Amino acid sequence: MEKDTLVLPSLSPVGDKPISVMIDDRCTSADGGVLLFQDVERRLNLANRLAACLHDPRQPGKITHALDDILRFRMLAIVAGYPDGNDCDVLRDDPAFKMALDRPPVSGPALCSQPTVSRIENLARRTELYRMAEAMLDLYCDSFPVVPHHLTLDLDESFDRVHGEQELRKFNAYYDDWGFLPIHIFDTSGRLVLSVLREAATPSGREILTLVKRVVNHIRERFPRVRIRLRGDSHYACPEVMSWCEATGLEYIFGLSGNATLAARVQALEARTGARYAARCAAEPPKFKLRRYKDFQGGAKSWNCTRRIIARVEAGPDGVDTRYIVTNLTDRRAQGLYERKYCQRGRMENRECPA
């Protein structure tokens, strides 16, 4: 029986030979998707960008695997679902991975081993890690076909559990586990700006400010006239960051943790909103929660000035819930700022709908 062959012309050729997909019992792989990722990586030139930031201490005449190939192999393994470096000892002979690194699938030499990957992963020092972060920021800036007029940068962190005794691991009481708490920065289009691996502790205001300064200053070097807005939850509403934003012309809109002082400012509004919702329930079960806003100037002992605070009071079947945000934006009403500007951040964790 003749074997059907599907030619994928969009895949990059290997050694001037076109890549085809066919039924073949010999030399099979379950990871053909890495060829698609390889095309993306080549277009971004990501492995070469990062390799250029590293100093290779190996003797040139004894190098079998180039730095960019090692990094490329490691990245492709991660996106294919093999985050453990130990998997490289098996994947190094996988035909799909060989083709992704421009090697013949059968006769080509094996890729690098796990010890080589581990040595390269521990090669970078602080200055080289900083250069790699700058390379990622350059990659982000290069992704724009035209100079942007406005950028909104979303700051957030995620808990990354560990399954061993990795360096810098730390116990986090909130998540009740060991791991890391990396900070991620995305823009509103979903582009990754930067991710920073760090220990599993709540970042301090000084740490956040240092990161924000480096990111913003790098973007402004490329786009001097761009308007930048920072957005994040209450972890990032620290006085150091807000004061720096105000001094350098940055916009910000952050979540704000509640306290007794803020609660006193909205106590009357909470009572009225809860009573109105209860009255509606008595007449007819409402289809939506009832939401009201209060816009006022407030402050904290650690702040050097008062700032605009918006309280969102929402009454529903579970009672009255109040959230706060703080911002230096002055050109919008409270409802629009909260619903259209703040709640758009973190698509996976903020799905609040206007009442």
Predicted regions and their residues:
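Dynamic "connector" segments at or just before major functional cores
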Residues: 1-202, 209-222
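An anionic, glycine-rich sequence signature occurring as long contiguous blocks
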Residues: 2-19, 23, 251-354
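Generic recognition of stable, solvent-exposed alpha-helical segments in well-folded globular domains
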Residues: 32-35, 68, 83, 87, ...
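Flexible loop/turn segments at secondary-structure boundaries
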Residues: 97-98, 160-162, 202, 235-240, ...
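Short, well-ordered coil/turn segments that N-cap beta-strands
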Residues: 149-151, 224-228, 250
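Acidic/histidine-rich, metal-coordinating catalytic segments
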Residues: 156, 227-237
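Short, surface-exposed basic-aromatic patches at helix termini and helix-loop junctions that form
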Residues: 242-251
